[in-house]
UniProtKB/Swiss-Prot annotation:
Effect of D135G: Inhibits poly(A) polymerase and RNA degradation activities. Inhibits the import or stabilization of RNase P RNA into the mitochondrial matrix. Does not inhibit homotrimerization activity
Induction (free text): Up-regulated in cells upon senescence and terminal differentiation. Up-regulated after treatment with IFNB1/IFN-beta.
This protein's encoding gene: PNPT1
UniProt source species: Homo sapiens
Entry annotated with the keyword Repeat: no
Record-given protein name: Polyribonucleotide nucleotidyltransferase 1, mitochondrial
Length: 783
């Protein structure tokens, strides 16, 4: 029972085997006391890391102590708790079954969820994107063949609206894994770098980030190695970007030292897994003998495309596996499969390293053939087809009103600082893009991540004062590597085709890496960088380094690294190699369309502003907004108020705008009012009697206005009937123009009368008057 875990919620000991085991009742209280004593004796430990003007506090041993590893990372008043748990029995999966979930709680910001159930439902885009960043930072450091279900949960405990929690979560995951007995070759440290007024700022606050031209997250490993990069930038220069990476790596080393100090104080001992799922050297050696020459022939046959190459490799795989099963009948099925994978990867990589050639015949720095086409469909606001090798992407642009942008509720704004967004890019990867069958409903994490990267690439060139919400869709029709960067290229072309005045064209490219490692030192002794990688080069390589930008600078970057760290030198070379390729792609794109169209498509949407005087606003809006709703329903336009007298009208087509304009002109038409003279006396017709006064018209097509009781007579009255007034009766009134505050017409009957000179008693009935003598019907009419 020493290997069991105690669960206080159900008073059970859970053995590490799957079956539950219930303690005898007499032993339960004793077991609970023993666990509590262990907690109190262990205590909690904490370290603080100084990062320039910021301080990072890392603690463990106080919260979530049943987990294999747990930690709380805090900066200012923002705190994130991270737990790590890994099973001790292997998973049937033939890959590393790691799940990372980052969750934001409304309570962390002192708010209540705004949905119907008033609780956290589903996962937001921000949570998914943060989970992906954490996953990419820690996954490369698990040992090869560690196929044990592992879960890392990041729980936002508190957010102060100043310090961003995502970088804290990366560091928290590193601490939780380092302090656990889970096999993991960490730690890693992560920081955010911003450039504000030319200064490099470490972990800038949310307010500082609003004025930063760079948002770079760097995850580093010991010895100044880089594990993960994620960045968006305002088209900054390459040298500034490279320097920011170096600054980030420097500060990650300080965090790593703090974590190592905490691990040393805790005295962590890593568990020994039952087995690591790596094939035996004997089977690999025999596989090498069977398949090496045939694989070499396939990988050096430059006539193959993706489909034929995959078919040829699969044929060799089936033949080899059959022979391996005969030779090693007792071998695990996984060893048979993985042995072939090891040999195939070895042959593929040796060709790149030794012969400087790639499986499609290109040299290391060559691009695939690129072709572009715009204005694919006339009815679309903008469209483009981007083809790079066997990767094909169709991008479209759609305009809508500013009201159609993404709206953030109060909770999201409080936690993330994200406000309304009027530019978005949505990426779709249907199964037919790789000749597969699969579900097409819902949005998976990969699609969201790729779309977010392409959106970052294009956002800096979008004009901030554009009068429409812009939605770019990117549908991958064929995929053989780097579809996210193809989406950035296609999106740029579609934006120019639609007439969006972007400041510059944007292109993106992916750089791959193949390394040779010294088996004794574990360090990279040789490597090759590959420009514009294929899918097979991504699979067999060590890095997928995506970078996008303009001719001038960089707008987005994402580095997925499969090694437990690469030197800064390789990253700098990758950026330089990508910049050369990016400019070459832009030259090809400019041959198709070199600048945005001077005007939008004829069938595109239209936006206009309409001036509605305060005096006409009530009629324009109508009772309960009736006129506005009717206008929007009949014409399809969207109307939003800009200020007191200005309304913005969005129409999906010019014809809809024409209809709306006629409707507005007709409903607000009032020709006679311009002829009314200030201070003149006019004859008004009573159309309605109310408790507060009478509704009158000065001319037939006028909207009735209220003549208040206080302006009916010199004497104070409680109801118009006290004066004998009736519907249809004509009375004399004086015109005093419009009220500048609310635009209402100002009329008075009282000023045409002589002041009252007598005072009488107050009556309580509706016909009573307060001041002066009772007025007969005849006297009223005479007035």
């Amino acid at each position: 029972m020493a290997a069991c875990r105690y669960c206080c919620s159900c008073l059970r000991l859970r053995p590490l085997s799957d079956g539950p085991f219930l303690l005898p009742r007499r032993d339960r209280a004793l077991t609970q006391l023993q666990v509590r004593a262990l907690w109190s004796s262990a205590g909690s430990r904490a370290v603080a890391v100084d990062l320039g003007n910021r301080k990072l506090e890392i603690s463990s041993g106080k919260l979530a102590r049943f987990a294999d590893g747990s930690a709380v990372v805090q900066s200012g008043d923002t705190a994130v708790m991270v737990t790590a748990v890994s099973k001790t029995k292997p998973s049937p999966s033939q890959f590393m079954p790691l799940v990372v979930d980052y969750r934001q709680k409304a309570a962390a910001a002192g708010r209540i969820p705004t949905n119907y159930l008033r609780r956290e439902i589903g996962t937001s885009d921000k949570e998914i994107l943060t989970s992906r960043i954490i996953d990419r930072s820690i996954r490369p450091l698990f040992p090869a063949g560690y196929f044990y279900d592992t879960q890392v949960l990041c729980n936002l405990l508190a957010v102060d609206g100043v310090n961003e929690p995502d970088v804290l979560a990366i560091n928290g995951a590193s601490v939780a894994l380092s302090l656990s007995d889970i096999p993991w070759n960490g730690p890693v440290g992560a920081v955010r770098i911003g450039i504000i007024d030319g200064e490099y700022v470490v972990n800038p606050t949310r307010k500082e980030m609003s004025s930063s031209t760079l948002n770079l997250v760097v995850a580093g490993a010991p010895k100044s190695q880089i594990v993960m990069l994620e960045a968006s930038a305002e088209n900054i220069l390459q040298q500034d970007f490279c320097h920011a990476i170096k600054v980030g790596v420097k500060y990650t080393q300080q965090i790593i030292q703090g974590i190592q100090q905490l691990v040393k104080e805790t005295g962590v001992t890593k568990r020994t897994p039952q087995k690591l799922f790596t094939p035996s050297p004997e089977i690999v050696k025999y596989t090498h003998k069977l398949a090496m020459e045939r694989l070499y022939a396939v990988f050096t046959d430059y006539e193959h495309d993706k489909v034929s190459r995959d078919e040829a490799v699969n044929k060799i795989r089936l033949d080899t596996e059959e022979q391996l099963k005969e030779k090693f009948p007792e071998a695990d099925p996984y060893e048979i499969i993985e042995s072939f994978n090891v040999v195939a990867k070895e042959v593929f990589r040796s060709i790149v390293l030794n012969e400087y050639k790639r499986c499609d015949g290109r040299d290391l720095t060559s691009l695939r053939n690129v072709s572009c086409e715009v204005d694919m469909f006339k009815t679309l606001h903008g469209s483009a087809l981007f083809q790079r090798g066997q990767t094909q992407v169709l991008c479209t642009v759609t305009f809508d009103s500013l009201e159609s942008g993404i709206k953030s509720d109060q909770v999201i704004t409080a936690i993330n600082g994200i406000k309304d967004k009027n530019f978005m890019l949505h990426y779709e990867f249907p199964p037919y893009a790789t000749n597969e069958i699969g579900k097409v409903t819902g949005l998976n994490r990969r699609e969201l991540g790729h779309g977010a990267l392409a959106e970052k690439a294009l956002y800096p060139v979008i004009p901030r004062d554009f009068p429409f919400t812009i939605r770019v869709t990117s549908e991958v029709l064929e995929s053989n590597g780097s579809s996210s960067m193809a989406s950035a290229c296609g999106g740029s072309l579609a934006l120019m085709d639609s007439g969006v005045p972007i400041s510059s064209a944007v292109a993106g490219v992916a750089i791959g890496l193949v390394t040779k490692t010294d088996p004794e030192k574990g360090e990279i002794e040789d490597y090759r960088l590959l420009t514009d990688i294929l899918g097979i080069e991504d699979y067999n390589g060590d890095m997928d380094f995506k970078i996008a930008g303009t001719n001038k600078g960089i707008t987005a970057l994402q580095a997925d690294i499969k090694l437990p760290g690469i030197p800064i030198k390789i990253v700098m070379e990758a950026i330089q190699q990508a910049s050369v390729a990016k400019k070459e792609i832009l030259q090809i794109m400019n041959k198709t369309i070199s600048k945005p169209r001077a005007s939008r498509k004829e069938n595109g949407p239209v936006v206009e502003t309409v001036q509605v005087p305060l005096s006409k606003r009530a009629k324009f809006v109508g009772p309960g907004g009736y006129n506005l709703k009717k206008l929007q329903a009949e014409t399809g336009v969207t109307i939003s108020q800009v200020d007191e007298e200005t309304f913005s009208v969005f129409a999906p087509t010019p014809s809809a705008m024409h209809e709306a304009r006629d409707f507005i002109t007709e409903i607000c038409k009032d020709d006679q009012e311009q002829q009314l003279e200030f201070g003149a006396v006019y004859t008004a017709t009573i159309t309605e009697i109310r408790d507060t006064g009478v509704m009158v018209k000065l001319y037939p097509n006028m909207t009735a206005v209220l003549l208040h009781n206080t302006q009916l007579d010199q004497r104070k009255i409680k109801h118009p009937t006290a004066l004998g007034l009736e519907v249809g009766q004509e009375i004399q009134v004086k015109y005093f123009g419009r009220d500048p505050a609310d635009g209402r017409m100002r009329l008075s009957r009282k000023v045409l009368q002589s002041p009252a000179t007598t005072v009488v008693r107050t009556l309580n009935d509706r016909s009573s008057i307060v001041m002066g003598e009772p007025i007969s019907q005849s006297s009223s009419n005479s007035q």
